[in-house]
């Protein structure tokens, strides 16, 4: 085929068509009740009436993966970074009590590699399956003047729904509520500019370095996908009146736990009430970070926190265990005096 004007400008239209064909099977496995239309429509459609909600409230979220992408690019491993993208979006709207309904992705790249693009979308579809959300649309933009040939950026967008009377908003959490933490898989998708600095700039580790404290090569540890908490937490919401939910992302415990509180409340976190994953000890050691800095930046092994009444703790733990989740009582809500997050025993600064 003769090279057209667009190709001469650096945009491979044929490669774009190949991507669409390659991803169809991945999109198909995410279909759920309510989806209307087919891949390739101008707009993705979803029938809200299929949910049988009396007063539906739509909850939306958007996020990316940050500089974790640079590790995926350097390692040439692209099949799980899409899970991270989905997780960052759906876990956020779950904090409002919403069930994710559908997801859209956006990939911008310097050169469209159909195999690589398929791997990225495969990860997105895997994440959508875990979340029960349909992948109903997306965009792959080839922009050779903006990105290097091997570079790409990834962002996602999700919409969920919740019955209005079950919407979780600030104000429901009360002094005396108990905090239940659900484990993370590792670093998840925040703090990677610092992570990369610690390992590859300040200490000159190789991607596949074997570190004694870790049970997998370094890059495998750093690329572990962010956990998606949707299905187990939705089961809890069916059986327990959850007062608050926090997705522990950028800003760690210090920034995120107060987001579910009113200004007159604080949380007391019981240090030692859950196992700290080895990767955090390794980063603290090689990054020469103090304890407070770690809790200000990272999830420290807890990816989501629920606030429930004391009398609902046993039921909450029971439902989580029944759904394959380890869970820990990690603290309580108190009346605020000074700081909004208090660590029992204090932290080294």
UniProtKB/Swiss-Prot annotation:
Record pathway: Purine metabolism; IMP biosynthesis via de novo pathway; 5-amino-1-(5-phospho-D-ribosyl)imidazole from N(2)-formyl-N(1)-(5-phospho-D-ribosyl)glycinamide: step 2/2
Organism: Listeria welshimeri serovar 6b (strain ATCC 35897 / DSM 20650 / CCUG 15529 / CIP 8149 / NCTC 11857 / SLCC 5334 / V8)
A single cellular component GO annotation: cytosol
Gene name as annotated: purM
Biological processes per GO annotation: 'de novo' IMP biosynthetic process; adenine biosynthetic process
Protein name: Phosphoribosylformylglycinamidine cyclo-ligase
EC supergroup of this enzyme: ligase
Molecular function via GO: ATP binding; phosphoribosylamine-glycine ligase activity; phosphoribosylformylglycinamidine cyclo-ligase activity
Family the UniProt entry places it in: Belongs to the AIR synthase family.
Subcellular localization(s) per the UniProt record: Cytoplasm
HAMAP family noted in UniProt: AIRS (MF_00741)
EC number(s) recorded for this UniProt protein: 6.3.3.1
């Amino acid at each position: 085929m003769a090279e057209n004007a667009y190709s001469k400008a650096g945009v491979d239209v044929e490669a774009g068509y190949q991507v669409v064909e390659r991803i169809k099977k991945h999109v198909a496995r995410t279909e759920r009740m309510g989806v209307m239309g087919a891949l390739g429509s101008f707009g993705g459609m979803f029938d809200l009436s299929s949910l049988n909600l009396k007063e539906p409230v739509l909850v939306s979220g958007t996020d990316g993966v940050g500089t974790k992408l640079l590790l995926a690019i350097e390692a040439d491993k692209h099949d799980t970074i899409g899970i991270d993208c989905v997780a960052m979006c759906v876990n956020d709207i779950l904090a409002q009590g919403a069930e994710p309904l559908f997801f859209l992705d956006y990939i911008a790249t310097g050169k469209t590699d159909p195999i690589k693009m398929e791997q990225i979308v495969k990860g997105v579809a895997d994440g959508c399956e875990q979340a029960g959300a349909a992948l109903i649309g997306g965009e792959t933009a080839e922009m050779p003047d903006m990105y290097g040939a091997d570079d790409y950026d990834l962002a996602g967008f999700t919409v969920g729904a919740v019955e209005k009377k079950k919407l979780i908003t600030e104000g429901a959490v009360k002094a005396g509520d108990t905090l239940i933490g659900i484990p993370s898989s590792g670093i998840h998708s925040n703090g990677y500019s610092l992570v990369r600095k610690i390992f590859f700039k300040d200490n000159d580790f190789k991607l596949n370095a074997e570190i004694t404290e870790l049970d997998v090569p370094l890059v495998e540890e750093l690329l572990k996908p962010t956990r998606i908490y949707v299905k187990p937490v939705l089961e809890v919401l069916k059986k327990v009146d959850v007062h608050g939910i926090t997705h522990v992302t950028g800003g760690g415990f210090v920034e995120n736990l107060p987001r579910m509180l009113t200004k007159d409340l604080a949380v007391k976190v019981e240090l030692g009430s859950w196992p700290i994953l080895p990767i955090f000890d390794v980063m603290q050691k090689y990054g020469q970070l103090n304890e407070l800095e770690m809790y200000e930046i990272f999830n420290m092994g807890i990816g989501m926190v629920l606030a429930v009444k004391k009398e609902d703790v046993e039921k909450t733990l029971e439902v989580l265990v029944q759904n394959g989740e380890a869970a820990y009582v990690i603290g309580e809500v108190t009346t605020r005096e000074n700081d909004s997050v208090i660590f029992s025993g204090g932290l080294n600064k």
